[in-house]
Each structure stands twice: as C-alpha cells, then as structure tokens.
Amino acid sequence: MIDSNMVAQAVPDRDQELSFLADAAQLALDHARGLGADSCETSASVHFGLNVNVRLGEVETLEHSRDRGLGISIYLGNSKGHATSGDLRPETIRKCVEKALDIARFTQADKCNGLAPVDRLAKHFPDLDLWHPQALDADSTTMRALACEAAGLENAKISNSDGATASSSFGLSVYANSNGFIGRRDGTRFSQSCVLIAGEGESMQRDYWYDSRRAFSDLESVEETGHKAARRTVRRLGARNIATCEVPV
C-alpha cells in the first residue's frame, strides 16, 4: 500500500497563494520600472498536481507536482525582452527582470510589440465557477485508476490494456502590467481515462475514453469510464479498408 501521507494532494489556500503571486508580480513590475523599462507585463503561477498511471493491475507511475513560475516581458520602446524563472524568491525575480531588460536592449524593434490599450482591458471579472477543491490522496487516486481499468477488462473481447490514469490538479495565476491592470485566475480539474486493446494478431484495435471535470463530484464513475472505453474499442473490430471512390460529403 502506498504511504498516502507522503504524497497526499492537499488543497492549497487559494487566497494565500494568489496574494503571494500578486506580490511576486508587483515586485517584478516595480523592479522593471525602476531599471528604466518603458512598460512591462508579468504572469506568475503555481500548479499542484497528483497523477497515477496503472497498467494490468500494477502501478506504473505516481507523480506529485508543485510548480511555481514567473515570466516577465519588458518593453524599451518597441523592443521586447522576455525571461522566465521557476524560483519566486525576491532576489531571483530581480535577476529575471534584469535578464529580460538586457534582452530588450539588443532586440530589434517591432511596431506590434507593446501592451494592450488601457481602454481594452477588462474591468469586471465574473465568477466562472472553476474552483472546486477537494483533497485526494495517492491511495484513493490509485484505486480509482485500478477500478477504471478493471471495469474495461471485464469485456470478454478486450485482450489487453494500455493503462488507466486518474489525476487531480489545482492551478492559480496572476497577470499584471505597468498600466495598472491585475487579474487573477484559479481552477481545479479532475480526470480519469482508460486505453484498451481488443482482438489478436493483425486484427487488434485500440481505443479509449476519458472524463474530465472541474468538480470531482461531477465525474462519471470510474467503472463507466472503463466500460465506455471497452465499448469504443470493441466496435472497431471487423473494420476494413474501402476501395478508392467518390462519395458525397
């Protein structure tokens, strides 16, 4: 059994993470303007993920990720420099800004470079209902993937499996520019998939099914995903090539 305490998918504190990203973005903008940038824009993000792949009843991979990143674009007139960093410590952000500025100094001007006009920037941000956090540990995620594959293999015409996957992810990001705009985005995603093989020898066919939702509770059952993958795979059996011909479209 997997030690779920080691790879549990904890729910991030949305407000705390967005505040941290906003501070990082503001630091980048302030440093860029302080160094002489005519205008600048930046995006900071964080992603948390848990992904389990199984095949033929065995766990193949288990991945737990927590990635942060920041990108900064600096404009000197119509010359643009861009740099990114996966480290959001203040000193690293400042170095990233300085690299982008160095690039801008040696980049050919392009009249299409620059920020969007202020009057074209969004001022109202409706709630799109994309944030539905739920804590899932490695054990339960693995069981979902195994159950999904097992359901597909119940079909007697299924001869093999290319595996099943169960995953969950949380993403948060902040975009800001020197025109005073700042926007925040958040979202969750939960998914499951199954890939199966039917037939033998030269008559084998392969197909899949998956389900992906913002809210874990909206997912179809893993058994249904496996059964759909099996039905889609089996219906490919007996397929044959047709002769070249003219047909209505």
Show which residues each predicted segment covers:
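Active-site bordering "gate/hinge" segments
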Residues: 1-248
